[in-house]
Amino acid sequence: MNRQSWLLNLSLLKTHPAFRAVFLARFISIVSLGLLGVAVPVQIQMMTHSTWQVGLSVTLTGGAMFIGLMVGGVLADRYERKKVILLARGTCGIGFIGLCVNALLPEPSLLAIYLLGLWDGFFASLGVTALLAATPALVGRENLMQAGAITMLTVRLGSVISPMLGGILLASGGVAWNYGLAAAGTFITLLPLLTLPRLPVPPQPRENPFIALLAAFRFLLASPLIGGIALLGGLVTMASAVRVLYPALAMSWQMSAAQIGLLYAAIPLGAAIGALTSGQLAHSVRPGLIMLVSTVGSFLAVGLFAIMPIWIAGVICLALFGWLSAISSLLQYTLLQTQTPENMLGRMNGLWTAQNVTGDAIGAALLGGLGAMMTPVASASVSGFGLVIIGLLLLLVLGELRRFRQTPPVSDAG
């Protein structure tokens, strides 16, 4: 990586064929899952005219994802990771085919949608954990920051493209097209993934899966460094749940429908800028301190967001949150991968990803509770400034993370 450039170096895609294969598979997978994410709520709403039923499907899928992350972490530390990745992707695609067939029936089954949502949520997250655990072996630990930034860009780009494509397909061909293309995309991802090298796990004693997962929890709690990283990740994810207040805040700012879309686009845009300008981040000597400061700064941006007098200033605050949270997330990912023993990478990646899922749900619930007691402006500000106070306390308490120093890696990617 060029030490003189703040811009992200994409040369890793050229020099590491295995990572390039993962990049292609991940992008296609994100677009496929995005098509699914648009189709399922629309189909359930059309069938039931009940927002509660739509919410139930999201909750069930989220629960299945959480279990899949836990199980996937154990499997990724026990079995050859390439096999786990391929099995999870292929099985997930079968579920998409089931949704497509169900949508083509004269009377689609609501129960089938719920059950297949559980199926796909479980196997999709199972494969994600194994892929995360395999990344250090694919790119080398010295290139993890660069790989993480490229992955973040992939996710953001795919998350923008897939809802737009999904909406066009719904308008022109109905939900069956979304499901069918999602299934096709998922099976297409198997082609680049088949080119991956074998990804064996370190030898370790066989033990009960629950005991293996408990060992990961003990490691997390016993390590001030890894535990602090996981805690910060959960808090940042909680802060991002402020999006549940966008519709109410948009009314107070008297925003048009088109302008409301800018609120939803601001955080992904800021995160993309953060990833694009992360070229020097891997060479920081004190990544823990930068992580803590950027996290507190992101909370401050959320606190200021709602009290801005005009909506444009609010959008700028959200973009700032996206940028700072991207810096924090990239450092979390890199330190987690480099400081976790190889034989625990699967389980720790599963726990770290799971806290993102649960943190978002907890944040949304807390904001909903605050919204019942105070105005949307007050709810967003109280949550943001409350997290600032917690962040400042953690800046003092997490001494090992704050003082952590590393030797800047010498990348062979560029």
From Swiss-Prot:
For this record, the Gene Ontology CC terms, alphabetical, are: plasma membrane
User: What protein name does the entry list?
Assistant: Enterobactin exporter EntS
- The residues on the Cytoplasmic side of the membrane are 1-21, 77-83, 131-156, 200-218, 278-287, 337-356, 400-414
Please name one Pfam family that this protein belongs to. Answer: MFS_3
Task: Quote one Gene Ontology molecular function term.
Answer: enterobactin transmembrane transporter activity
Q: Which UniProt keywords apply?
A: Cell inner membrane, Cell membrane, Membrane, Transmembrane, Transmembrane helix, Transport
| Protein family | Belongs to the major facilitator superfamily. EntS (TC 2.A.1.38) family.
Q: How does the entry describe its membrane topology? A: Multi-pass membrane protein
- Please state the protein's primary subcellular location: membrane
> Where located?
Cell inner membrane
Which residue ranges does UniProt annotate as crossing the membrane?
Answer: 22-42, 56-76, 84-104, 110-130, 157-177, 179-199, 219-239, 257-277, 288-307, 314-336, 357-377, 379-399
- Which InterPro entries does the entry link to? Enterobactin_exp_EntS, MFS_dom, MFS_trans_sf, TM_effector
Entry function:
Component of an export pathway for enterobactin.
User: Which segments sit on the Periplasmic face?
Assistant: 43-55, 105-109, 178, 240-256, 308-313, 378
Highest taxon listed in the record's lineage: Bacteria
